[in-house]
Amino acid sequence: MIALVPAAGSGSRFGAPSPKQYLQLNGKPLMWHTLATVAAVPDVDEVAVVISPQDEWFDDFAWDLPKLSVHRVGGASRAQSVASGLAALACADDDWVLVHDAARCCLSVAAVERLIAALSGHAVGGLLALPVPDTVKRADIDGHVAATVPRNGLWLAQTPQMFRAGLLARALSSAAAEDITDEASAVERLGVKPLLVEGDAQNFKITYPRDLALARAILAARDEY
Protein backbone atom coordinates (compact mmCIF):
# COMPACT_ATOMS: atom_id res chain seq x y z
CA MET A 1 0.00 0.00 0.00
CA ILE A 2 1.24 3.46 -0.94
CA ALA A 3 0.49 6.67 0.93
CA LEU A 4 0.53 9.74 -1.30
CA VAL A 5 0.85 13.15 0.34
CA PRO A 6 0.30 16.12 -2.01
CA ALA A 7 2.37 19.04 -0.69
CA ALA A 8 2.76 21.41 -3.62
CA GLY A 9 0.46 24.12 -2.26
CA SER A 10 1.64 27.61 -1.40
CA GLY A 11 -0.57 28.05 1.67
CA SER A 12 -1.58 31.55 0.55
CA ARG A 13 -4.40 31.82 3.10
CA PHE A 14 -1.90 31.31 5.88
CA GLY A 15 0.07 34.47 5.14
CA ALA A 16 3.45 32.97 6.10
CA PRO A 17 6.76 33.53 4.25
CA SER A 18 6.98 29.82 3.43
CA PRO A 19 4.28 27.25 2.66
CA LYS A 20 2.57 26.14 5.86
CA GLN A 21 3.80 22.54 5.52
CA TYR A 22 7.29 23.82 6.34
CA LEU A 23 6.42 25.92 9.39
CA GLN A 24 8.06 24.81 12.62
CA LEU A 25 5.77 22.82 14.89
CA ASN A 26 7.21 21.42 18.10
CA GLY A 27 10.72 21.56 16.71
CA LYS A 28 10.07 20.00 13.31
CA PRO A 29 8.41 21.03 10.05
CA LEU A 30 4.64 20.68 10.24
CA MET A 31 4.68 18.11 7.44
CA TRP A 32 7.22 15.96 9.29
CA HIS A 33 4.54 15.02 11.81
CA THR A 34 2.17 14.10 8.97
CA LEU A 35 4.71 11.92 7.19
CA ALA A 36 5.94 10.28 10.40
CA THR A 37 2.43 9.16 11.34
CA VAL A 38 1.69 7.70 7.93
CA ALA A 39 5.08 5.96 7.84
CA ALA A 40 4.31 4.36 11.22
CA VAL A 41 1.29 2.50 9.80
CA PRO A 42 2.42 -1.14 9.32
CA ASP A 43 0.37 -1.67 6.14
CA VAL A 44 1.95 1.32 4.38
CA ASP A 45 4.95 0.28 2.28
CA GLU A 46 5.87 3.68 0.84
CA VAL A 47 5.14 7.29 1.72
CA ALA A 48 5.32 9.37 -1.46
CA VAL A 49 5.34 13.13 -0.94
CA VAL A 50 4.56 15.22 -4.02
CA ILE A 51 6.09 18.69 -4.03
CA SER A 52 6.32 21.47 -6.59
CA PRO A 53 9.20 21.40 -9.09
CA GLN A 54 9.93 24.94 -7.83
CA ASP A 55 9.94 23.95 -4.14
CA GLU A 56 12.75 25.83 -2.35
CA TRP A 57 12.19 24.50 1.16
CA PHE A 58 12.04 20.69 1.27
CA ASP A 59 15.80 20.16 1.04
CA ASP A 60 16.44 22.56 3.93
CA PHE A 61 15.25 19.94 6.43
CA ALA A 62 16.53 16.54 7.56
CA TRP A 63 13.45 14.38 7.23
CA ASP A 64 15.06 11.13 8.39
CA LEU A 65 11.92 9.04 7.92
CA PRO A 66 11.49 5.45 6.74
CA LYS A 67 9.57 4.58 3.58
CA LEU A 68 9.83 8.15 2.25
CA SER A 69 10.11 9.00 -1.45
CA VAL A 70 9.99 12.51 -2.91
CA HIS A 71 8.48 13.42 -6.28
CA ARG A 72 8.88 16.94 -7.68
CA VAL A 73 5.88 16.70 -9.99
CA GLY A 74 3.29 18.76 -8.13
CA GLY A 75 0.78 20.76 -10.16
CA ALA A 76 -1.29 23.90 -9.79
CA SER A 77 -4.08 22.07 -7.97
CA ARG A 78 -4.38 19.25 -5.49
CA ALA A 79 -5.98 17.01 -8.12
CA GLN A 80 -3.13 17.66 -10.56
CA SER A 81 -0.55 16.86 -7.88
CA VAL A 82 -2.25 13.59 -6.96
CA ALA A 83 -2.62 12.57 -10.62
CA SER A 84 1.03 13.39 -11.34
CA GLY A 85 2.11 11.53 -8.23
CA LEU A 86 0.20 8.43 -9.30
CA ALA A 87 1.82 8.57 -12.73
CA ALA A 88 5.29 8.94 -11.20
CA LEU A 89 4.73 5.95 -8.92
CA ALA A 90 3.57 3.68 -11.76
CA CYS A 91 1.20 1.84 -9.44
CA ALA A 92 -0.62 -1.30 -10.51
CA ASP A 93 -4.34 -0.68 -10.99
CA ASP A 94 -5.22 -2.88 -8.02
CA ASP A 95 -2.80 -1.20 -5.60
CA TRP A 96 -4.43 0.63 -2.73
CA VAL A 97 -3.44 4.29 -2.43
CA LEU A 98 -3.99 6.41 0.67
CA VAL A 99 -4.10 10.14 -0.14
CA HIS A 100 -3.57 12.39 2.87
CA ASP A 101 -3.35 16.15 3.33
CA ALA A 102 0.10 17.37 4.32
CA ALA A 103 -1.56 19.91 6.62
CA ARG A 104 -3.46 17.30 8.67
CA CYS A 105 -0.51 16.79 11.00
CA CYS A 106 -2.50 15.48 13.99
CA LEU A 107 -3.61 12.29 12.24
CA SER A 108 -3.28 9.18 14.41
CA VAL A 109 -2.05 5.75 13.38
CA ALA A 110 -5.21 4.28 14.92
CA ALA A 111 -7.43 6.32 12.58
CA VAL A 112 -5.54 5.12 9.51
CA GLU A 113 -5.71 1.52 10.68
CA ARG A 114 -9.45 1.91 11.25
CA LEU A 115 -9.89 3.13 7.67
CA ILE A 116 -7.80 0.30 6.23
CA ALA A 117 -9.72 -2.32 8.21
CA ALA A 118 -13.10 -0.91 7.16
CA LEU A 119 -12.16 -0.94 3.47
CA SER A 120 -10.66 -4.41 3.38
CA GLY A 121 -12.47 -6.10 0.52
CA HIS A 122 -14.53 -3.01 -0.35
CA ALA A 123 -15.24 -2.63 -4.05
CA VAL A 124 -14.70 1.13 -4.23
CA GLY A 125 -12.77 2.58 -1.30
CA GLY A 126 -13.60 5.38 1.07
CA LEU A 127 -12.49 8.11 3.39
CA LEU A 128 -12.33 9.26 6.97
CA ALA A 129 -15.10 11.71 7.79
CA LEU A 130 -17.09 13.09 10.72
CA PRO A 131 -20.87 13.46 11.07
CA VAL A 132 -21.81 17.16 11.17
CA PRO A 133 -22.43 17.94 14.87
CA ASP A 134 -23.80 21.49 14.58
CA THR A 135 -26.88 23.09 13.10
CA VAL A 136 -26.12 24.15 9.52
CA LYS A 137 -27.34 27.44 8.02
CA ARG A 138 -27.33 28.41 4.36
CA ALA A 139 -26.67 32.12 3.83
CA ASP A 140 -28.03 34.44 1.19
CA ILE A 141 -25.87 36.90 -0.74
CA ASP A 142 -26.20 39.50 2.04
CA GLY A 143 -25.14 37.15 4.83
CA HIS A 144 -28.60 36.53 6.24
CA VAL A 145 -29.96 33.06 6.94
CA ALA A 146 -31.63 31.73 3.81
CA ALA A 147 -32.41 28.28 5.21
CA THR A 148 -31.57 25.78 7.90
CA VAL A 149 -30.14 22.64 6.34
CA PRO A 150 -31.10 19.30 7.93
CA ARG A 151 -27.85 17.76 9.14
CA ASN A 152 -29.03 14.16 9.01
CA GLY A 153 -26.68 12.33 6.68
CA LEU A 154 -24.21 15.22 6.39
CA TRP A 155 -20.54 14.43 6.97
CA LEU A 156 -17.35 16.50 6.95
CA ALA A 157 -14.76 14.87 4.70
CA GLN A 158 -11.27 14.29 6.07
CA THR A 159 -8.25 12.39 4.82
CA PRO A 160 -6.78 9.86 4.28
CA GLN A 161 -8.96 8.88 1.35
CA MET A 162 -8.26 5.37 0.13
CA PHE A 163 -8.90 4.03 -3.38
CA ARG A 164 -7.44 1.58 -5.87
CA ALA A 165 -4.84 3.32 -8.01
CA GLY A 166 -6.56 2.52 -11.31
CA LEU A 167 -9.96 3.80 -10.18
CA LEU A 168 -8.43 6.94 -8.71
CA ALA A 169 -6.41 7.71 -11.84
CA ARG A 170 -9.50 7.30 -14.05
CA ALA A 171 -11.57 9.45 -11.72
CA LEU A 172 -9.03 12.27 -11.65
CA SER A 173 -8.63 12.17 -15.43
CA SER A 174 -12.40 12.31 -15.91
CA ALA A 175 -12.72 15.25 -13.52
CA ALA A 176 -9.70 17.17 -14.82
CA ALA A 177 -11.82 20.08 -16.01
CA GLU A 178 -13.82 20.26 -12.78
CA ASP A 179 -13.01 22.13 -9.58
CA ILE A 180 -12.85 19.14 -7.26
CA THR A 181 -11.50 19.50 -3.74
CA ASP A 182 -10.91 15.87 -2.80
CA GLU A 183 -10.40 12.45 -4.35
CA ALA A 184 -13.79 11.14 -3.25
CA SER A 185 -15.52 13.87 -5.27
CA ALA A 186 -13.77 12.67 -8.41
CA VAL A 187 -14.61 9.03 -7.70
CA GLU A 188 -18.28 9.89 -7.04
CA ARG A 189 -18.51 11.40 -10.54
CA LEU A 190 -17.96 7.89 -11.94
CA GLY A 191 -21.24 6.81 -10.36
CA VAL A 192 -19.82 4.80 -7.47
CA LYS A 193 -20.16 5.36 -3.74
CA PRO A 194 -17.13 5.60 -1.42
CA LEU A 195 -17.58 4.38 2.13
CA LEU A 196 -17.61 6.91 4.98
CA VAL A 197 -15.50 5.76 7.95
CA GLU A 198 -15.74 7.78 11.15
CA GLY A 199 -12.60 9.81 11.69
CA ASP A 200 -11.30 11.90 14.56
CA ALA A 201 -11.88 15.55 15.49
CA GLN A 202 -8.14 15.92 16.12
CA ASN A 203 -7.49 15.14 12.46
CA PHE A 204 -8.21 18.71 11.38
CA LYS A 205 -6.51 20.62 8.59
CA ILE A 206 -4.16 23.45 9.51
CA THR A 207 -5.66 26.37 7.59
CA TYR A 208 -5.15 29.52 9.67
CA PRO A 209 -2.40 30.62 12.11
CA ARG A 210 -4.72 30.09 15.07
CA ASP A 211 -4.83 26.36 14.24
CA LEU A 212 -1.17 25.95 15.18
CA ALA A 213 -1.72 26.36 18.92
CA LEU A 214 -4.18 23.46 19.00
CA ALA A 215 -1.89 21.29 16.89
CA ARG A 216 1.04 22.03 19.21
CA ALA A 217 -0.99 20.96 22.22
CA ILE A 218 -2.21 17.73 20.59
CA LEU A 219 1.24 16.70 19.40
CA ALA A 220 2.90 17.62 22.70
CA ALA A 221 0.50 15.29 24.51
CA ARG A 222 1.53 12.32 22.37
CA ASP A 223 4.44 9.99 22.95
CA GLU A 224 4.43 8.55 19.42
CA TYR A 225 7.71 10.02 18.26
From Swiss-Prot:
Reactions performed catalytically: 2-C-methyl-D-erythritol 4-phosphate + CTP + H(+) = 4-CDP-2-C-methyl-D-erythritol + diphosphate
Annotated positions for site Transition state stabilizer: R13, K20
UniProt xrefs under InterPro entries: IspD (IPR001228), IspD/TarI (IPR034683), IspD/TarI_cytidylyltransf_bact (IPR050088), ISPD_synthase_CS (IPR018294), Nucleotide-diphossugar_trans (IPR029044)
Enzyme Commission code: 2.7.7.60
Record bears the keyword Iron: no
Keyword Nucleotidyltransferase in annotation: yes
Gene3D superfamilies assigned: Spore Coat Polysaccharide Biosynthesis Protein SpsA, Chain A
GO MF terms, alphabetically ordered: 2-C-methyl-D-erythritol 4-phosphate cytidylyltransferase activity
Single GO BP term: isopentenyl diphosphate biosynthetic process, methylerythritol 4-phosphate pathway
Keyword vocabulary terms for this entry: Isoprene biosynthesis, Nucleotidyltransferase, Transferase
Lineage: superkingdom: Bacteria
Pathway membership, UniProt: Isoprenoid biosynthesis; isopentenyl diphosphate biosynthesis via DXP pathway; isopentenyl diphosphate from 1-deoxy-D-xylulose 5-phosphate: step 2/6
Site-annotated residues for Positions MEP for the nucleophilic attack: R151, K205
Function as written in the Swiss-Prot or TrEMBL entry: Catalyzes the formation of 4-diphosphocytidyl-2-C-methyl-D-erythritol from CTP and 2-C-methyl-D-erythritol 4-phosphate (MEP).
Family, as annotated: Belongs to the IspD/TarI cytidylyltransferase family. IspD subfamily.
Annotated PANTHER family: 2-C-METHYL-D-ERYTHRITOL 4-PHOSPHATE CYTIDYLYLTRANSFERASE, CHLOROPLASTIC (PTHR32125:SF4)
UniProt name for this protein: 2-C-methyl-D-erythritol 4-phosphate cytidylyltransferase
Gene source species: Chromobacterium violaceum (strain ATCC 12472 / DSM 30191 / JCM 1249 / CCUG 213 / NBRC 12614 / NCIMB 9131 / NCTC 9757 / MK)
Phylogenetic classification of the source organism: Bacteria, Pseudomonadati, Pseudomonadota, Betaproteobacteria, Neisseriales
